[in-house]
From Swiss-Prot:
The protein's role, per its UniProt record: Involved in base excision repair of DNA damaged by oxidation or by mutagenic agents. Acts as a DNA glycosylase that recognizes and removes damaged bases. Has a preference for oxidized purines, such as 7,8-dihydro-8-oxoguanine (8-oxoG). Has AP (apurinic/apyrimidinic) lyase activity and introduces nicks in the DNA strand. Cleaves the DNA backbone by beta-delta elimination to generate a single-strand break at the site of the removed base with both 3'- and 5'-phosphates.
Alphabetized PANTHER family for the sequence: FORMAMIDOPYRIMIDINE-DNA GLYCOSYLASE
Catalyses which reaction(s): Hydrolysis of DNA containing ring-opened 7-methylguanine residues, releasing 2,6-diamino-4-hydroxy-5-(N-methyl)formamidopyrimidine; 2'-deoxyribonucleotide-(2'-deoxyribose 5'-phosphate)-2'-deoxyribonucleotide-DNA = a 3'-end 2'-deoxyribonucleotide-(2,3-dehydro-2,3-deoxyribose 5'-phosphate)-DNA + a 5'-end 5'-phospho-2'-deoxyribonucleoside-DNA + H(+)
Highest classification ranks of the organism: Bacteria, Pseudomonadati, Pseudomonadota, Betaproteobacteria, Nitrosomonadales
InterPro entries in UniProt: DNA_glyclase/AP_lyase_DNA-bd, Formamido-pyr_DNA_Glyclase, FPG_cat, MutM-like_N-ter, Ribosomal_uS13-like_H2TH, Znf_DNA_glyclase/AP_lyase, Znf_FPG/IleRS
Single Gene Ontology MF annotation: class I DNA-(apurinic or apyrimidinic site) endonuclease activity
GO biological process, one term: base-excision repair
Family: Belongs to the FPG family.
Quaternary assembly: Monomer.
Name of the protein in its database record: Formamidopyrimidine-DNA glycosylase
Active site annotation, chain numbering: 2-3, 57, 260
Length: 279
């Protein structure tokens, strides 16, 4: 699933459309994670795109007539193409603009979303429950320690909770915990303030590094311009089971947390060896 860096890379790739006017909205397949509203062609026709911003893993497109909320799901892409580009099998939604370009939703698994939010997108039920933006100043060590002080769940699971902090999925949680030297099974409430500060710092740095690399392209992700990301080439632990740690040469191990594969270095991330770890 695209995480914060991939969504932000996509948003930035669509920015050239700001100021353009919609000439046509085309719904080819309305059956996404939630049905694409059938009235979108009417409310978007003739509307100018005013703003593109990100909230967590959602992109909010503000038009003169209201706001679209876009989510890439597990395998979705938003492509910026020429309007005469012939649609492919999994191209489900188009926005054609007067300047001759089209924003196209491509989603083989159809877990993505195209929703209408009117004039108050932040009050939408999907957005108003979201936690802190990890790159904002408000997400700091003191905030994290206060938020997790009563939580006994593993810190890896907690840092992926979008009600606490948004956009930190499986890849970037694993990478950030490695950089911070924290075992993923550590109970969240056991972290000291110093550890919370270090973890917050590494979350921010990891996400910023991923943004600079254009995100991670493991299977489905490509930016709006069709280019892949390259951050996967620098992973410390994610997907590197059995390979030597880039720091200490210890083989990377994997365990299951919350139905997710969690990668870590047993030497660099000290903690009680977990019973369900697989070398």
């Amino acid at each position: 699933m695209p995480e914060l860096p991939e969504v932000e890379v996509t948003r930035r790739g669509l920015e050239p459309l700001i100021g353009a006017t919609v000439t046509q909205a085309v719904i080819r397949q309305p059956a996404m994670r939630w049905p694409i509203p059938s009235h979108l062609p009417q409310v978007l026709h003739g509307a100018r795109l005013l703003e593109l911003r990100r909230r967590g893993k959602y992109i909010i497109a503000r038009f003169e007539s209201g706001c679209l909320i876009l989510h890439l799901g597990m395998s979705g892409r938003l492509c910026l193409l020429e309007s005469d580009t012939f649609p492919e099998k999994h191209d489900h939604f188009d926005l054609h603009f007067a300047d001759g370009r089209v924003m196209r939703m491509r989603d083989p698994r159809r877990f993505g979303a195209v929703l209408w939010a009117g004039d108050q997108p932040d009050e939408h039920s999907l957005l108003k429950v979201l936690g802190q933006e990890p790159l904002d100043e408000a997400f700091n060590g003191e905030f994290l320690q206060q938020a997790i002080r009563t939580r006994s769940s593993p810190i890896k699971t907690v840092i992926m909770d979008s009600h606490l902090v948004v956009g930190v999925g499986n890849i970037y949680a694993s990478e950030s915990l490695f950089r911070a030297g924290i075992h993923p099974e550590t109970p969240a409430r056991a972290l000291t303030l110093a550890q919370c500060r270090r973890l917050v710092e590494e979350v921010k740095l990891t996400l910023q590094d991923a943004l600079q690399a254009g995100g991670s392209s493991l299977r489905d992700f490509f930016g709006a311009d069709g280019n892949p990301g390259y951050f996967q080439q620098t992973y410390f632990v994610y997907g590197r089971t059995g390979q030597p740690c880039r720091v200490c040469q210890t083989p990377i191990a994997v365990l299951r947390l919350g139905q997710r594969s969690t990668f870590y270095c047993p030497a660099c991330q000290q903690g009680q060896p977990p019973s369900n770890a697989m070398p």
